[in-house]
Amino acid sequence: MFDYGLLDDPDGLAAVDVSGLLRAAASAGAQVRSTAGAATDAGLDRLTGERPRALVLVTRPGATAAAAPLLVALLGPSCPVPVVRCEAVPSWTGALDVVLAHTADPGDQELAVGVDRALRRGAQVVLTAPPDGPVAAAAAGRSVLLAPRIDVPPGLVLPRALAAGLLLLDALGLLRVDLDALAGELDSEAERCHPGHESFVNPAKSLTLRMVGRTPLLWGTDTVATAVAAHAATALAAHAGVVAHAAGWHEAAALPALRVVAARGSAEPDVFHDPYLDEEPSGGLPAVRPMLLSVETDPGSVAARRGAIDALPGADPVTAGEELMVAATDPAAAAAAVAVLALRFDLAALYLGLGSGVLGGSAFGGVGLFR
């Protein structure tokens, strides 16, 4: 049972959020700035101008599992360098390659072995990891090691992992970014979603209310938004214990039974509907909440968005804001929209978890599973 009163009770939220999860999530902008500072101190600029044979994104459990798809989506199909996503450092990695990896687990033995092998073969390695343990030892003195400067739970470090990736892409000349501006947008989003702001003016709380008691169907109308949807589904599972379906709109549209559920189950119930006496308006189908996520405004993405809205008029459109809707030819601006949407879903998932009693006190331990 969701506690609706708690959602607009800042003192009550603070009382149940004993681990400071909302505050940790709101540090997204600070995570980005601190990662940029760590990159400067670690000498990431020595990779400036490099054109690797391949860019290897190692997706260990946790933040990089979300950061890597976001980076690939931002690069798009015109990226001049092959981008390889894998769970472990490939055995073929050599002197012509650049490896990017993130872990919150200092004892990740598989990553430590892979990093050591890649470095011995001459690859350039950029690693965000704790400064102690086997992973850091394997990378010591031979890689660009970005140690965390702000302590946040492992399930809320996507801004750090994403910032490290964006910094590397900028150094390689693959994607120009303004991390100061991106951090500023994250600060603004954190302020809009502050626990002290009521639901009708708080984007994250509003998003939470739209998902209470329903299965979210998170469908992206463009490639970048689809990658955000995947992160949102992970955040909902990690912080609220909610199972969601994440996919691109065209992929979801190819699932006929799911489209039927979405079309029938997304309609709002009649105000006079009695759930105990009346037949369910959805015909007994599961209660779902279709959400159409959008980032890009190129003609193809706009057409997909309109087609999705026409097919599912009851679906909720979700964007980072009109000022952050960008053309597909401006992936640097899209990075800010990606970060803002990801943060909004992180905060919404936390509000949902706290309001439903899944989080709070010792219940927070589950977030640590997503490292």
Predicted regions span which residues?
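Phosphate-moiety recognition in structured ligand-binding domains
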Residues: M1-T40, A123-S143, L167-D170, V177-G184, ...
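N-terminal, Lys/Arg-enriched amphipathic/low-complexity engagement segments
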Residues: A14-V72
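Active-site phosphate/pyrophosphate-binding segments
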Residues: D17-A24, S34-G43, E50, D170-E280, ...
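Short, highly selective alpha-helical patches that border small-molecule cofactor pockets
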Residues: A25, A68, V72, L111, ...
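Glycine-rich phosphate-binding loops that contact phosphosugars or nucleotide phosphates
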Residues: G49-E191, V295
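Catalytic-loop motifs flanking and including active-site residues across diverse enzymes
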Residues: A67, V157-A164, V228, A232, ...
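Short helix-loop-beta junction
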Residues: L70-V84, T234-V243, A311-P317
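A generic structural motif
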Residues: P82-V89, T128-A129, V242-A254, P317-A332
